Amino acid sequence: MKPKEIDKADIEILMDVDFLVSVIVAIGEVANITGVPQRKIRYWDEKGIIEPVDKTSTYRQYNYLNIKKVVLVQELLDEGFTLDAAAKKVNERYTKVAEVFKRVSALKDHQKK
């Protein structure tokens, strides 16, 4: 059976950068989504591995990219990496992901014109 081709509309839905960038989730939900305990998320926040959206607020809320960082760091820890090594590897990958987000966003802006 031949796999179904993904049409342009499906790709736009999957790559809705504007939506992904606007997603902001409280620490409890991040813990529920990722399976990583809040205490561990707070520790990673204190170490600078992830950053809340508003550093001045007493409420810890995170955007999509930071939620993704939590998932990736935990996966690397599960594979046996140290926290520092996992954070370094994720930050390198995060830089690449951020560049892709910028390019996709720029392409979407260009298409609107």
Give the positions of each predicted feature.
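Minor-groove-contacting beta-hairpin "wing" of winged helix-turn-helix DNA-binding domains
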Residues: 58-64
